[in-house]
């Protein structure tokens, strides 16, 4: 039996939207985070630099990690490291943690390598005993790659004398919830268009769609949930069936909707979706 945990994750795309905006820098996370049943806060970026001697911490990382620390217990803080990875990945991660320990209140306690479709992240994570962060879990190609990623991760762990643990596998799934799908779709009209070029570049949607068509496409291809708690539960069950079980479900802290509607979506997810899975439990073979 695997106890599924839930959390939020900030990615480079979302962080870029916040730079230079002191109000959003301060308020992107939940002010009452510990009260809403979320059990993890993650930040994903390209931390490890390609050459030795350079800082492993990008200039903006310290402030974001400090913000995370203010809203979560240290045991719940995670870092997802995005490709490209260097040959000396382990020394790079150790350098990163050492620098963060000097610069922030508490250093993160969970490290995972981010994977989209390529098997590289699963291979390296399995070899070095890092977690696996499936940032592209709901893209068409990323969803299809989930079973092979776990097989590679588990095989590499076994080859290095360990048994892979599913609770070290986190999936990212974009969601915005409201009481009705119509309300949710109306709310994300506020900011969804700024993500359109990125989604087109990733091959998730065609380019130059209207905001309404963009939202409908994201829903139809299962990349995102823009709807009700029942839609969110259906998506999570779909991911559980595809993977055989994983440890964490992370919601991107994006700017689709305004701050009030975003916080209400987080709260609704907590009251309904998290409560559903905590009451029913989730299992993994």
In which residue ranges do the predicted regions lie?
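Conserved, mostly hydrophobic/aromatic
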Residues: 45, 68, 125, 153, ...
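Short, acidic/polar
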Residues: 20-33, 92-93, 115-123, 232-239
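Glycine-rich, proline-tolerant flexible connector loops at the mouths of alpha/beta enzymes
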Residues: 40-64, 83-87, 137-142, 250-261
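N-terminal beta1-alpha1-beta2 module of alpha/beta enzyme domains
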Residues: 1-71
